[in-house]
């Protein structure tokens, strides 16, 4: 799984189910694929979205700014700055500065995520604010590691508030991961269908999978309900690849 897929998984885990979540999932997919190149339009769209908390908007704004190429002098957005100020708590800012110094020495996505997980969501948001306001610079991978750790802390607190048993791997994040991987698998099937005799069949299976994922994101589902989705998709893909004589390894 590429780290961008992981970022999409974690970010979606903190967004309430509904049509807006499906829309955000599509925007993230487009941004990571390099299809959405107007940061100003994207940020204006984000600013006016209902339902989302200021912090969620701040995190999404941070992700979009990291990913979409922009002019050097492009002004930072106030709604993102306000969301990433750690609630104005000096304690959060002190911890954010300490974390930033550690992240500056880190170069990997997973390393940054591990370091960040020992801090509170407030301190993590403040650290994102430092980077967003150009007061500090880290690699893009490290910044995304910080994003994922923040989302994990938020998802954990949301999960606890649902009074469900907290396990080592958050069910909300596992659920989003299955959804993202199912969507990725559907894409692989569409790509393979290009010049084959079974193209129509593959495209139909992929299309059904995409519709199912879209419906589940829009309607909202319990984390356990997506468990069979990815497995069904992978079985369909494997059966199709077997007929085509294609090695599964290429698409893992």
Swiss-Prot record:
It is a peripheral membrane protein. Gene3D superfamilies: 1.10.10.180, 1.20.91.10. The keyword Membrane applies. SUPFAM superfamilies: Influenza virus matrix protein M1. Residues 1-164 are annotated as: Membrane-binding. It is found in: Virion membrane; Host nucleus. Pfam families: Flu_M1, Flu_M1_C. Keywords: Host nucleus, Membrane, RNA-binding, Viral matrix protein, Virion. Residues 165-252 are annotated as: RNP-binding. Its main location: virion. The keyword Amino-acid biosynthesis does not apply. GO terms for molecular function: RNA binding; structural constituent of virion. Homodimer and homomultimer. Interacts with NEP. Binds ribonucleocapsid by both interacting with genomic RNA and NP protein. May interact with HA and NA. Cannot bind NP without genomic RNA. Most abundant protein in virion. When expressed alone can form virus-like particles in transfected cells. This is Matrix protein 1. It comes from Influenza A virus (strain A/X-31 H3N2).
